[in-house]
Amino acid sequence: QAWVKWAWLEELGSGLIVLSGADQGALGAALLAGDEARAETLAARLAGLFPQRFYIELQRAGLPSHEAHVRAAVPLAARLGLPVVATHPVQFLEADDYDAHEARVCIAEGETLANPRRIKRFTPEQHFKTAAQMAELFADVPSAIANTVAIARRCSLTLVLGKPQLPDFPTPIMADGKPQPMDAFFRELS
């Protein structure tokens, strides 16, 4: 599981838009464990670090934890005056790709599809959804869809296909006053 130090968020979080991680994040785990006090503390801390940029994330992809999380997260967001956002944990392109995805998962885990005790972490619903499908999934929480659209607009960018667009990554300055070439720098690091 990924993690980030609070100090990093405090130091480097300027301009970030932060989602809570749905049922898989620390806030979601607290809600699913019934620890509303911890969930409220986490949400308040994140909202303080990221004013107008922290969203409680909701997902509905057919896992039991998703609906339990939504039932706990929406009231928490309302109590704290925080926005919710709808996202979808996509694992494959189309619904018909589910069986192939499960076969790949079994290969990676050394399992067989026929094993009735195999832990199933994915559902057939984890394909790309259309805007209409997402709106239907969250018809009872329309603000979650509206916030998804608002975040997408805030994050708009233009990519040129076939041309890598890498972040500016400063390298150490060499004796001649020029930055060290990236390939040489990364070769030293490896």
Residue ranges of predicted features:
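Phosphodiester-processing cores and adjacent nucleic acid-binding clamps
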Residues: 1-190
